């Protein structure tokens, strides 16, 4: 395929996946697949110099909201990312850096004047966001007033815990209507209108501050800025001071917390930023990234091959859903033998076959949830049950509206 056509195809596919991911719809690809396609697009753009304006490499994100569109006072740019600790060490150089979680929610920017909350904007495309100030009483963790009389701008992540996510999904009877993950639910919730504020409040979306964007007074220490936010009443993202020499140990230790299931707040990586906030502001802007604002680290997805034994059809409410049951395989410190296949469309996309010889490629998404990302070798075809395995009623295929 011509490289320019390949770029156009990748942009279209990635944008469709991003729109589904950010706007409360069903996921159409895994983070693992998205990252791989994004990296391929980046390489092709660098090689050819052919960059479409709508390319995801040029945009911070996708979202829909019922709020009025409004320009950001300070652009909310995305961060460059890597999967190599060595890149973080080079970026840190000889300077102390702070490591924190990369929370998997929706970025918001909150503004205060004379001690009062005056604005809540979503990140949008990084330049223009949606004004959702009308949700100020429904989002937890955003103080209505602060003990500061100047102009204050704070950036943070609005997220839903796994505990609340599971409780909310349990109230949805139709499996096809359930949310794919907490990020998906948070984004869909913040896209609701003023008539649904009670529903927003019931979902316990919490704001976690990760950057003090503007303060009238000079405060050059990133750590002091975070301490100040805590004094003002914000919940800040967890953070730890380190340097290039200590980064590997800190990253490994924090990663273990995710692998051991200690995190109730969804995360999809780590972030480092300079302790010297003044130095961080001196970087250039390349593409849609501020070169010294921070550096994101995403975990390498460790995959393992295994053989599919059979597909089990799991019943919940009025829906039966496919689950891959495969030969046990060691992955990320645990042994896994089952993974959801979501629905019939996903089985068809993957190319699932059921004759005991189909080879699957399995990962643990975000180091937690087993997920089938591909079929290495397909043997046979799969069979859709004619009758429910529980109540024995005749089955029918339904197409989700989403």
Predicted stretch roles:
Residues 1-146, 184, 258, 265-267, ...:
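Phosphate/adenylate-binding "loop-and-lid" substructures adjacent to NTP/NAD/dNTP-binding pockets
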Residues 86-89, 157, 162-348, 370-371, ...:
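Long, charge-dense accessory insertions within large macromolecular proteins
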Residues 113-114, 122-125, 325-328, 343, ...:
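A short beta-strand motif that forms part of the nucleic acid-binding face
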Residues 364-402:
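Structural signature for extended repeat/solenoid scaffolds and their inter-repeat hinge/linker regions
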């Amino acid at each position: 395929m011509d490289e320019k056509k390949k770029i156009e195809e990748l942009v279209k596919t990635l944008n469709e996946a991003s729109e589904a991911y950010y706007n409360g719809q069903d996921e159409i690809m895994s983070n693992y697949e998205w990252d791989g396609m994004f990296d391929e697009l980046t390489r092709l753009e660098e090689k050819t110099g052919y960059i479409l304006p709508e390319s995801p490499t040029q945009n911070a994100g996708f979202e829909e909201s019922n709020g009025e569109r409004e320009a950001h006072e300070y652009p909310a740019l995305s961060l460059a990312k890597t999967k190599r600790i060595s890149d973080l060490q080079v970026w840190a150089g000889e300077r102390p850096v702070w490591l924190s979680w990369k929370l998997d929610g929706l970025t918001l920017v909150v503004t205060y004047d004379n001690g009062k909350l005056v604005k809540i904007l979503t990140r949008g495309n990084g330049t223009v966001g949606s004004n959702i100030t009308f949700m100020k009483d429904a989002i937890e963790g955003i103080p209505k007033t602060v003990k500061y009389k100047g102009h204050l701008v704070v950036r943070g992540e609005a997220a839903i815990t796994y505990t609340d996510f599971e409780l909310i999904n349990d109230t949805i009877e139709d499996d096809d209507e359930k949310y794919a993950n907490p990020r998906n639910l948070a984004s869909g919730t913040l896209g609701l209108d003023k008539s649904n504020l009670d529903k927003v409040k019931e979902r316990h979306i919490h704001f976690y501050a990760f950057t003090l964007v503007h303060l009238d007074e000079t405060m050059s220490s990133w750590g002091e800025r975070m301490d100040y936010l805590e004094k003002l009443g914000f919940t800040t993202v967890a953070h730890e001071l380190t340097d290039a020499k200590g980064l590997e140990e800190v990253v490994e230790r924090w990663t273990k917390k995710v692998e051991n299931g200690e995190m109730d707040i969804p995360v999809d990586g780590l972030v480092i930023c300079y302790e010297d906030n003044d130095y961080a502001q001196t970087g250039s802007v390349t593409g849609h990234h501020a070169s010294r604002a921070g550096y994101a680290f995403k975990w390498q997805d460790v995959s393992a091959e295994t053989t599919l034994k059979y597909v089990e059809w799991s019943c919940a409410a009025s829906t039966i859903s496919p689950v891959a049951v495969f030969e046990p395989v060691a992955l990320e410190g645990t042994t896994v033998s089952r993974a959801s296949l979501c629905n019939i469309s996903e089985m068809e996309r993957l190319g699932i076959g059921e004759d005991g010889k189909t080879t699957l490629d399995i990962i643990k998404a975000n180091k937690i949830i087993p997920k089938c990302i591909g079929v290495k070798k397909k043997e046979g075809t799969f069979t859709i049950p004619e009758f429910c395995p529980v109540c024995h009623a005749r089955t029918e295929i339904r197409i989700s509206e989403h």
